[in-house]
């Protein structure tokens, strides 16, 4: 679906990562961890086709007609718009809002448990509710690859667990690249996990792949996940 070949990124003369190679496959969750400032969020921006001020070398190759949606860490809902109009934002912005798009948006809000609030402005929502609306808007775009940048990091533990399960259920037929700082989140949701490393470690840009066993979303009490979590923490500790 997407191939990243020999990709390097530098800002103001400082190399964040170099010679990165990664292939994203259909219908798969891949998680990417790493220390702050190593370029994880910028990598998502590059995949989304958003310009960056850094110096980029290498290639990102897409299969024909691959559609991509990006859910950034920073809130992107418009507080003065209703929830349903935030979900159908593309139609609103480009003058294509219709009964059909509104009904589809309401259907997606029902899937994320927000149907009763469709008429409210987003300014009245809690953090967890906003993430549900953002997820519905992502689904509205009907894409193949979803880029998630720390989507649950601002939520309390219970809401985070609920939203993880909901996202996995609703995105089960999509490819997902998840940037997260939470090893447990990666282990619950992903088929493959990597740590992105800076060149200062004198290692390859990506760690060896970690492959959790069993079907996601997983229960964290599994003994093998505890071992993999320790492996991830050791890898991340080497990045500090």
Curated annotation (Swiss-Prot):
Pfam families: ABC_tran. Keywords: ATP-binding, Nucleotide-binding, Transport. ATP binds at residues 34-41. The keyword Nucleotide-binding applies. Residues 2-223 form the ABC transporter domain. InterPro entries: AAA+_ATPase, ABC_transporter-like_ATP-bd, ABC_transporter-like_CS, ABC_transporter_ATP-bind, P-loop_NTPase. Belongs to the ABC transporter superfamily. PANTHER family: ALIPHATIC SULFONATES IMPORT ATP-BINDING PROTEIN SSUB 2, TAURINE IMPORT ATP-BINDING PROTEIN-RELATED. This is Uncharacterized ABC transporter ATP-binding protein HI_0354. It comes from Haemophilus influenzae (strain ATCC 51907 / DSM 11121 / KW20 / Rd).
